[in-house]
Design a protein with these regions (language model features):
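N-terminal helix-turn-helix DNA-binding module of bacterial transcription factors
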Residues: 1-59
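Flexible loop/hinge segments that line or gate small-molecule binding clefts
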Residues: 131-172, 257, 283-295
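Flexible loop/turn connectors
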Residues: 240-348
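Short acidic capping loops at alpha-helix termini that bridge into adjacent secondary structure
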Residues: 186-187, 218-221, 273-279
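Short, well-structured alpha-helical segments in soluble
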Residues: 111-125, 233-247
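Hinge/beta->alpha junction and helix N-cap segments in small-molecule ligand-binding domains
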Residues: 71-85, 103-111, 165-175, 191-238, ...
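Amphipathic helical "hinge" segments at domain boundaries
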Residues: 46-116
């Protein structure tokens, strides 16, 4: 267990600088203080070893968090950079219930499914939480044959009896379209990625439905597929802009990839946002990823949702449940400065 310098300093009422000098074997600290620091480290290590021993004695098996990579267009970045805070919380939750926590990435193109299934059987894995955004229904069949509880994140295999924890994509897109229409926009175009996954399919269906409900025309003719990388989206968006914007006053941006690629093309042409073109995005972006643009955003919850799914899986291991559930997490609309209120200025 790695103990942070600031935690040692706080526990021993020393300055972080003093602790750093001791740990790096630097001069300037008296022997009594050095001894206090090293004694504390030994004490913490003994306590940690005892904790591990107790956990091993009480261990009921392992819970696996499995990220399933089909093509890598959506989950590749997550797989390469796991969310440490989420995994720390999941590991703690599993430990409290007497289970080990394990994280694994399966690449469909290069991995061997039979080896993965054999490994799951041999490792005393009691349940699996799937990061399943890229999966299709047939992908889940081999795992169902393991006859252990599973919970699905970011997908829906309801008819197969698998519980799911999802962002309410339809509610989010409805919220976004309504926001634009209420601001006076009707010529709205939906910018999409090329890949078909569950989350995107739900968003596209909701766009078509809400455009019809709000009497804004046929949404199927207002959908433009641009690509699956920021560069591909940027190039396709430039080609679209070369043909000029015909009546279009607002774009709904399907994902962070679309947002980054499309806004780059728009801003390079000095198109004024929001006066000439309004934008509303789906999914959060890193801070300052688009300098000078405060994007209006439809935001889902991810960390809390996946942690709740893991807690539900643990309950499934201890309680008999006959019902199949699907839990939708509502989105939030975060107002930025990227949507022009046409109604406010209609008479100006």
């Amino acid at each position: 267990m790695r103990i942070k310098s600031k935690d040692i300093a706080s526990a021993l009422m020393l300055s972080p600088a003093t602790v750093s000098l001791v740990l790096n074997n630097k001069p300037g600290v008296n022997e009594a203080t050095r001894k206090r620091v090293f004694d504390y480290l030994e004490e913490m290590e003994r306590a940690n070893q005892e904790k591990i021993k107790i956990q091993n004695e009480e261990n009921k098996g392992t819970i696996l968090f499995l990220t399933y990579i089909k093509h890598g267009l959506i989950l590749k970045q997550i797989a390469n950079q796991p969310v440490s805070r989420l995994f720390d919380d999941m590991q703690a939750q599993c430990a409290l219930s007497g289970y080990h926590f394990s994280y694994e990435v399966y690449h469909e193109k290069t991995g061997k499914l039979e080896e993965l299934l054999t490994s799951i059987k041999s490792r005393n894995i009691k349940g699996i939480y799937f990061m399943a955004a890229e999966m299709i229904q047939s992908d889940i069949y081999p795992f169902l044959k393991l006859n252990i509880p599973i919970v699905i994140g970011d997908n829906l295999f309801y008819e197969l009896g698998a519980d799911s924890y999802l962002v309410d994509n339809r509610e989010g897109i409805r919220r976004g379209v309504d926001y634009l229409v209420d601001k006076g926009h009707s010529h709205i175009v939906y910018l999409a990625q090329s890949v078909d996954i569950f989350n995107f399919s739900e968003r596209r269906k909701a766009f078509i439905e809400e455009m019809e409900i709000r009497q804004c025309g046929d949404g199927t003719n207002r959908m433009l597929r641009l690509g699956d990388t920021v560069q591909a989206v940027y190039e396709a968006m430039n080609q679209y802009l070369d043909r000029r914007l015909i009546k279009t006053t607002a774009f709904v941006l399907e994902s962070s990839v679309i947002t980054l690629g499309a806004t780059k093309a728009i801003l390079e042409r000095n198109i004024k946002i929001p006066r000439e073109l309004s934008l509303i995005g789906f999914d959060s972006l890193p801070m300052q990823s688009i300098p000078g643009l405060n994007l209006t955003l439809i935001k889902g919850t991810h960390t809390k949702r996946h942690l709740a799914g893991m807690k539900h899986l643990i309950r499934r291991l201890t309680e008999q449940e006959e019902e199949t559930i699907r839990v939708y997490y509502r989105t939030r609309l975060i107002e930025g400065d990227s949507v022009f209120d046409k109604k406010k200025y209609i008479y100006h």
